[in-house]
């Protein structure tokens, strides 16, 4: 199987981490959705969404669809709880990550990292600062209340909930909007704990090197 998409995307990271945790072999090909003219990518993702999964003659775009497919295709080491309530809660956190955390952080990451680093354009630093001051604190305040002192967001093992939330928080650490232990100690400890897992740590190290190059 092949996964297309740039690893700095939290949605690509989400799939790569899940695959690593489940032991699914994936060939990852770095690809920018805004500039790529790869015919395989364009055929599989007409709206230029990443990541894109290529599984023989089956193509699938969008991280939520991909992780659901991978869970069904490779049920070993489940990342979605089997208990109905826990599964519902895990799906809720996936939705929070995609529709609440990502929009809050995107203005910061896009203006401080994507525009200057990848598109050779100056970012709107005032917009980034305003987003950090107004949009991010409610997100961090909420997560501070719900993350556990030890363990995982849902149930007794790593789940898609932890993968999705942490994948988004990684990008905040890349754009000077990291969780501050003095303000959000539980969230900071949770992030440190989950992001230290080999599935995350390897990707984070690679992205740091890419951003520093």
Name what the model sees in each region:
Residues 88-91, 164, 188, 201:
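Generic structural signal for individual residues within well-ordered alpha-helical segments
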Residues 99-196:
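GST-like fold's C-terminal all-alpha helical module
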